[in-house]
Amino acid sequence: MKTYRRQIREKILQALYTIEIRDTDIDSAAGWLLTEEILADPNAMKFFNMLLKNIKEHMEEIDRYIVKHTFNWDMSRIAIIDKNIIRMALTEILYCEDIPPKVSINEAIEIAKKFNSTDKSSKFVNGILDAIFNDLKNEGKVHKNGRGLIDQSVTKLQKVEGEGENPESAS
């Protein structure tokens, strides 16, 4: 499954781009982009279907987050590719419990570099996603489990540093 995740993200990005420039639905646009390798791998198809389903179901909510964090920008002025990369990453952050947010953000940055709609696409995508992620985390809206847990290493470090210390005896 890991082998195909970036490829699947890129195919879904292409489908999202297609629906913005043509009069078609996302299922049709995504369906013709699938490769035989993806179709033959049940785990890859599971990831594809899950990501596509969540994007479709939550696009309006995702777009509200984007609008809130793109000050002085109208959604129509944001490059189509950049906007859809952000949509996809936010969908993963909010609705894919097993994918760490940092992985979703990093994948979005790498895809932005590859598709490079503008010279500053990867920086724009990174800035918007980072701002939205920080707000979502502060609002308690990011729910992860298993490998998707956030700040796991920080929590472990705090536990180790705090062991055996008595705050009252420190004075």
UniProtKB/Swiss-Prot annotation:
Biological process, per Gene Ontology: DNA-templated transcription termination; transcription antitermination
Matches recorded under CDD domains: Terminator_NusB
Pfam family, one: NusB
Gene Ontology cellular component list: cytosol
Keyword presence, Membrane: no
Record InterPro entries: NusB-like_sf, NusB_fam, NusB_RsmB_TIM44
GO MF, any single term: RNA binding
Keywords (A to Z) from UniProt: RNA-binding, Transcription, Transcription antitermination, Transcription regulation
Role noted for this protein: Involved in transcription antitermination. Required for transcription of ribosomal RNA (rRNA) genes. Binds specifically to the boxA antiterminator sequence of the ribosomal RNA (rrn) operons.
Family recorded in the similarity comment: Belongs to the NusB family.
Name listed for the protein in its UniProt record: Transcription antitermination protein NusB
Organismal lineage: Bacteria, Pseudomonadati, Chlorobiota, Chlorobiia, Chlorobiales
Name of the gene this protein is made from: nusB
